[in-house]
């Protein structure tokens, strides 16, 4: 939402009563169809009276262009007759909101409003039209094809794109960024400046702290001079607080630290409930990078060494983040020129668990897991605010005036999600759906304005990395009589993402013919084909359905599962013509767009069949699960807290085999769980090959039918897309 827009307010309590009453009855009486009455009441009582009326498409379009609501450049890529036809086609699909929350979310957060906030200027169809006009880039026939995919909820662009497409006064189409900080004042200063600029533009920024020298390290060879990373964290937190989008919301930021950094325990202590105000970090999110060796040390009940990043750089000429601590651990341990301190590995993991119960932080990135899966020559050193983006980066170098001596390569996230249920229902059109989705995300990467962050601009222009994700897994499973914690659920997840990966790589391969290969393609495991060995050098029936029920589903929806021969042909084409994009898939939490699409979030199970949300002045909103009715209720009945961590990790691990980046994995624990239970969850996720752990949510025991109480964590509005 742009800084000039305000959310419309309700004039009277009567405005609220009827549709809120209908919505509440969906929970009270277990009559989920009543929620559709809430939708109708909301549209009639709230939306229509506050929607500006136009007598023709031309009158509306002229008004929106003349008054700087719509970007004339987007409109002018098409004739008026084409615009009118696309708009007419959009309304011909007769889109209807599946629940009250979907309608409320659209008009509250996405619909274009007059600058004074009094009137709506768009319905859902109009917002979709502006997206397809931009994403089709002047191609009328493509716009019609893409219109079908979006308005049928098969593909949903991420919030920054869906919200801002076609607007004259807008934010960026991409709102998630990753920045390295190196161990010098110029890099620190430039990072803070860039953070302010990106946050000013509604961006969420993750920053790497692993390479900063520890507290007590030398400065200009004088010992015990460095203050360590905590003061930098304070500066960053203040920067995000200051850059608060004109008071609309505080900037979103995260910092990642390698767990073998000497300041790691102080880093974690900043999130303690009883932390001293001098070190306490309230709003900045924390993430840890944990290599395999740390788990091995904990398993053996050994002490873990923390290595001076300053000494590592002096000795090896490499930053801490750019070496494999697992591979070099014992060499570093024996090197007398590397200062080291020791802590108990098990105590370290216990501290993480304690903090997860207190705050939900830190995020965890499994260092060696993501780098083993990495197809590129440079190391992955961090993730983003939702722990689904894992891409290599390169450091920048600066002059003393903070101008660039050498522009490195940093990261931005271009995201969008498939609705799994609707994608399966697309049947034989699945390949076209994924082709259009990849092309749309690719276009966003090519039109995004990133001048304020030259290293991010360079990384984006060289790589055009994408993050095609997915949502509504639980919704699809439940409506097809499959329990979330069943072998059929894992089987379906495996084969679905196997199929999506094939079509995503195929789409990028076709784009490469038109747009060229991404930079350094020749130096990747894609170019030599080894990345695809998991598909081409296994038994021909390895990637096939293992349960009759799942095979029957693919047959029912007429979704063709790629064969090994299909993969071999695709790999040959990739080796010949390349890929347009360095990365293709990443599964974000999909908070906002799941509500907008009235479906279940990401790959997670629902929290309960009817979720309770608090939405400002409206109070509680009851959100029935996807197509919830009395027939499928039993498949939604056990929510995330009842299921426990194992089924969720099993699902994520099945998908992760085919996702070249990461998957936002949230763990749900009851208040009966112990730190030992959480440690078991970390180990299980690590052993199953998950790339990361996002939040840990802990539910407190409450009275039946009262609101679900969890540790209140500020969801990332940027990355939950």
From Swiss-Prot:
Enzyme Commission no: 1.17.4.1
Superkingdom of this protein's organism: Bacteria
Regulation of catalytic or functional activity: Under complex allosteric control mediated by deoxynucleoside triphosphates and ATP binding. The type of nucleotide bound at the specificity site determines substrate preference. It seems probable that ATP makes the enzyme reduce CDP and UDP, dGTP favors ADP reduction and dTTP favors GDP reduction.
PROSITE patterns reported for this sequence: RIBORED_LARGE
GO biological process, one term: deoxyribonucleotide biosynthetic process
GO cellular component: ribonucleoside-diphosphate reductase complex
GO molecular function: ATP binding; ribonucleoside-diphosphate reductase activity, thioredoxin disulfide as acceptor
Positions bearing the site annotation: Allosteric effector binding: 183, 213
Catalysed reactions, as listed in the record: a 2'-deoxyribonucleoside 5'-diphosphate + [thioredoxin]-disulfide + H2O = a ribonucleoside 5'-diphosphate + [thioredoxin]-dithiol
Paired cysteines (S-S): 176-413
Gene3D superfamilies, per database record: 1.10.1650.20, 3.20.70.20
Broad EC category: oxidoreductase
Residues under site feature: Interacts with thioredoxin/glutaredoxin: 716, 719
Database matches in InterPro entries: NrdE_NrdA_C, RNR_1b_NrdE, RNR_lg_C, RNR_lsu_N, RNR_N, RNR_R1-su_N, Rrm1
Positions with a binding annotation for substrate: 159, 175-176, 204, 384-388, 589-593
Record-marked site positions (Important for hydrogen atom transfer): 176, 413
Similarity field: Belongs to the ribonucleoside diphosphate reductase large chain family.
Protein name: Ribonucleoside-diphosphate reductase subunit alpha
Naturally occurring in which organism (per UniProt): Mycoplasma genitalium (strain ATCC 33530 / DSM 19775 / NCTC 10195 / G37)
